[in-house]
Each structure stands twice: as structure tokens, then as C-alpha cells.
Amino acid sequence: MQIDLESLKPWLGRTETKEDILTPSLIDRFRATFDAHLWAGAGDVPLGIHWCLTLDSAPGGSLSDDGHSPQGRFLPPVPLPSRMWAGSDVTHIAPLTVGQTVTRRSTIGDITAKQGRSGTLVFVAVN
């Protein structure tokens, strides 16, 4: 399948900003779920909790067959049947604190197409 990358270029540079608050309730639920796997020196807010913050919300009926939010909201409308997380790098600059407001800024930095064993793949790099 050929992907028209030119039609996806308008998404380059698109930014999404979301905020969330590190509530004691969220931290308690995270600790209860991952108790045995948490690093003892994590402090008041355990490492990894950032995956539970600033989540996208979409009505269940609007989710795609792959369980993701509809394409074309933040991510470009890539004409392929499924999406997956390909990897990331996380740097902890300072410890998070209970009650802190956390801001996530995501920017689409690059869109590339490659041929894999299963066919065409499109990689959307989000910074």
C-alpha cells in the first residue's frame, strides 16, 4: 500500500497540551496495582505514574477498532487498520510531588513510511 505522506504533512508541528493533578487517590491506586514492582526509593510519587496522567478521553462509541481515539484529532489520519506504541524515552528531571499539576506537551515531529514484513508501516514521532 502506498501512503501519501504529502497529505499528512499538515500535521507536522501540531501540538497538544494537557494538564492533570497528582492526587493522593491516584497515587494510592497506582501503588496498590504495582506494589511489588515499585522501586523502594521512589519517594511520595512513584516512578512510572506519568503513564496514568493526561490521558486522552473519548466516548467508547467513537473508539477505532484498535481501541484508540479517532484518528485526525491529534494524530494524523493514517489510512492503516491499526496503531501501536513503538517506543519512547523518558527522563525524570525532578521528583513529582503530591498535589502537583503536571503538564504534557506533545508535538508531532516527523512522519515516515517504511515497508515491513507485514506491509506498510507509518511512524509518527511525537516529541
Please place each PLM-identified region on the residue numbering:
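Hydrophobic beta-sheet segments that form the core/acyl-binding groove
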Residues: 83-127
